[in-house]
């Protein structure tokens, strides 16, 4: 495991299926994980998506804009020294690396050229598939994910190893 520095801001990448409890966990327990003197912020990809879409838009209609705003909000929090919780599925290493690359792009494009040092941790929501499906079935409107989509996503879900050197810490919930 990499060295964890309690004085450096942390990007916490949430990992888990829809319905695994990522957002609920953050509402209840994010404060327990944050060590930054500047506090923390939660950046929700779904909240960004729903703020950009009209009622008639396809779920993925503005995916590029959603991703850009998601990574920019993450970078903005890290830049001011906050711990940031990236609330989205991040099912596999490829999606986690895409997120980190997007945040790095924001740093490269930062107009004031402020160098933002931060570390990366992962919080894995290891919730059984049936529980995810049950929770999802209680959702309404756009928050309801098709059952088959979650089942398909479960086949792609990979958690990083606790010893993965890319991350300062890996938590399993």
In which residue ranges do the predicted regions lie?
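Conserved GTP-binding G-domain of TRAFAC-class P-loop NTPases and closely related GTPase folds
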Residues: 2-4, 8-15, 20-23, 28-33, ...
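Residue-level preference for the first positions of well-ordered beta-strands
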Residues: 9-13, 41, 81-85
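Conserved substrate/cofactor phosphate-moiety recognition/catalytic segment
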Residues: 24-82
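A structural signal for isolated positions on well-ordered beta-strands in alpha/beta enzyme cores
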Residues: 41, 121-123, 171
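A short, structured active-site edge motif that brings together acidic residues
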Residues: 46, 123-128
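Active-site loop signature of alpha/beta-hydrolase-fold enzymes
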Residues: 48-50, 91, 130
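Glycine-rich phosphate-binding loop used to anchor ATP phosphates in small-molecule kinases
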Residues: 61-121
